[in-house]
C-alpha cells in the first residue's frame, strides 16, 4: 500500500510539470487576443426624418489590417440593451444587412454609415454602434457612446372624403359667382343699348306737293 501511495503521489507532480508549460503558452496566446479594446465614435444626437429614417456615421480605430468586420446596432432602454440589427462584411465587399430590412449601411475604410428605417415615436432612444474586427487576429471590439435618436410621428392626413366635400363646395361657389357676374354684365349691356332708340318712328312724307296727301305720318310706341 505504501508503494502504491508513493507511486500515486509521484505521478501527479510529473503530470503537472508537463502540462504547466502548455497551459501557460495557451494563456499567453489567447488572453491578449480577447483583451484588446478599440475606440468607436458616433454623433450624440440625430433627428429622424418625417418618414422615420435616421442616419449616422460610426467611426472606429482600425489597426490597418482588418479584413473581416462585424457591425452591430444596439438600442438601450433603461438598463436593458437589445440588438436592432447586425452584419458581418469583408473590407473588399460592400456592407449589407441581408436578413434585416430595418437597417442599411455603407462602409468606407474605418467608417460605417448606418441608416435605420421605419422608426416611430416610440422608437426614440439611445442607439449604440458596436464594431468587431473579426479577422485576422488579434480580435478588437469597440462600442460607441451612443446616438440619441429622436423620432416625431407626422400628423395624420385629413379624411379624403372631407377634402372632396370641400372641393365640391368651392367649385359650386365659383360656378354660381361666375353665373351671377355674367347675368349682371348682360343686364348692364341691355340698359346701355336702350337710350339709342327714341321709342317713336316717324315716316317723313315726300317733299313734293303732289304726294303730300298720299302719305300720313305714324308712330310705333315701344314699351
Curated annotation (Swiss-Prot):
Name listed for the protein in its UniProt record: Cytotoxic T-lymphocyte protein 4
Residues in Ig-like V-type domain copies: 39-140
Organismal lineage: Eukaryota, Metazoa, Chordata, Craniata, Vertebrata
Disulphide linkage map: 58-129, 85-103
Signal peptide start and end residues: 1-35
Family matches, as InterPro entries: CTLA4 (IPR008096), CTLA4/CD28 (IPR040216), Ig-like_dom_sf (IPR036179), Ig-like_fold (IPR013783), Ig_V-set (IPR013106)
Gene: CTLA4
Subunit text: Homodimer; disulfide-linked. Binds to CD80/B7-1 and CD86/B7.2. Interacts with ICOSLG.
Transmembrane residue ranges: 162-182
Classification via CDD domains: IgV_CTLA-4 (cd05721)
Record organism: Canis lupus familiaris
UniProt region (Homodimerization), positions on chain: 46-50, 150-155
Amino acid at each position: 500500500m505504501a508503494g502504491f501511495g508513493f507511486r500515486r503521489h509521484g505521478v501527479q507532480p510529473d503530470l503537472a510539470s508537463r502540462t504547466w508549460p502548455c497551459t501557460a503558452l495557451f494563456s499567453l496566446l489567447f488572453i491578449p487576443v480577447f483583451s484588446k479594446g478599440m475606440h468607436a465614435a458616433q454623433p450624440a444626437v440625430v433627428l429622424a426624418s418625417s418618414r422615420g429614417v435616421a442616419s449616422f456615421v460610426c467611426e472606429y480605430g482600425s489597426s490597418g489590417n482588418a479584413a473581416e468586420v462585424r457591425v452591430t446596432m444596439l438600442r438601450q432602454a433603461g438598463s436593458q440593451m437589445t440588438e436592432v440589427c447586425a452584419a458581418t462584411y469583408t473590407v473588399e465587399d460592400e456592407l449589407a444587412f441581408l436578413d434585416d430590412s430595418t437597417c442599411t449601411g455603407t462602409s468606407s475604410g474605418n467608417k460605417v454609415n448606418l441608416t435605420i428605417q421605419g422608426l416611430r415615436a416610440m422608437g426614440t432612444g439611445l442607439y449604440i454602434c458596436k464594431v468587431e474586427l473579426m479577422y485576422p487576429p488579434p480580435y478588437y471590439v469597440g462600442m460607441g457612446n451612443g446616438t440619441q435618436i429622436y423620432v416625431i410621428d407626422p400628423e395624420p392626413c385629413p379624411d379624403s372624403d372631407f377634402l372632396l366635400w370641400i372641393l365640391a363646395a368651392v367649385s359650386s361657389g365659383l360656378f354660381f359667382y361666375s353665373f351671377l357676374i355674367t347675368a349682371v354684365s348682360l343686364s348692364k349691356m341691355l340698359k346701355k343699348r336702350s337710350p339709342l332708340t327714341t321709342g317713336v318712328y316717324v315716316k317723313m312724307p315726300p317733299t313734293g306737293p303732289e304726294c303730300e296727301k298720299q302719305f300720313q305720318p305714324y308712330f310705333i310706341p315701344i314699351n
